[in-house]
């Protein structure tokens, strides 16, 4: 854990040494990992002038090991309110700019943010990206996103929705099918469908 940034520094510096400019290195980690072992890696990016883009996937919880709180969640491990450390300000303090924040479930905004970060990198800057969307399993955050369904008449069986990697989506009778017991209504599949065959329905 935490190797997303440090390994990225090594790769980026290797590319720089060989004058490879057509590849961009992205270092990715979650918010919890950033706080416990990623901040030193972020410092290494600046210190070594590594041509890479650090990305923190902030879901406001420690999803990997059991939903423990972290310094960015606003609560201690005992559930008491605590100061909420700001990832963007930490990046800015290290010298990253621009620091871009985006909702990762908005695919258009996400692509625009990545393009903006790459453009800044090509200008010699040190951009950073923070994607922020609370985990749906956080009990204290009530999120009712409804769910999605497939309009079989519009579905062309192109399987673009399967590329999203959502466990709720499969193929049934030659058409895309969404398991209602697993769908959380994020609409990423609907955004990926080129035929508008996936529709949102409110709960």
Language-model features: where?
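Glycine/aspartate-rich loop-and-adjacent alpha/beta segment that forms the canonical ThDP
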Residues: 118-171
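Iron-sulfur cluster-binding cysteine motifs and their immediate structural context
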Residues: 156-177, 188-203
């Amino acid at each position: 854990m935490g190797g997303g940034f440090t390994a990225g520094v090594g790769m980026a510096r290797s590319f720089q040494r060989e004058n490879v400019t057509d590849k961009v290195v992205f270092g990715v980690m979650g918010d919890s990992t950033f706080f416990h072992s990623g901040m030193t890696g972020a410092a290494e990016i600046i210190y070594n002038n590594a041509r890479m883009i650090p990305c923190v996937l902030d879901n406001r919880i420690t999803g990997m090991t059991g939903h423990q709180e972290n310094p960015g969640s606003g609560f201690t491990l005992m559930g008491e309110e605590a100061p909420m450390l700001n990832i963007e300000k930490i990046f800015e303090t290290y010298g990253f700019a621009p620091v871009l924040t985006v909702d990762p479930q908005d695919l258009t905004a996400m692509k625009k943010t990545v393009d903006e970060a790459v453009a800044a990198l090509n200008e010699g800057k040190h951009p950073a990206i923070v994607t922020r969307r609370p985990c749906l399993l956080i009990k204290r955050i009530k999120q009712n996103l409804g769910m999605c369904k497939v309009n079989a008449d519009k579905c062309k069986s192109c399987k673009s929705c399967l590329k999203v990697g959502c466990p709720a989506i499969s193929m049934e009778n030659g058409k895309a099918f969404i398991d209602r017991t697993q769908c959380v209504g994020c609409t990423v599949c609907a955004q990926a469908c080129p035929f508008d065959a996936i529709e949102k329905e409110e709960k």
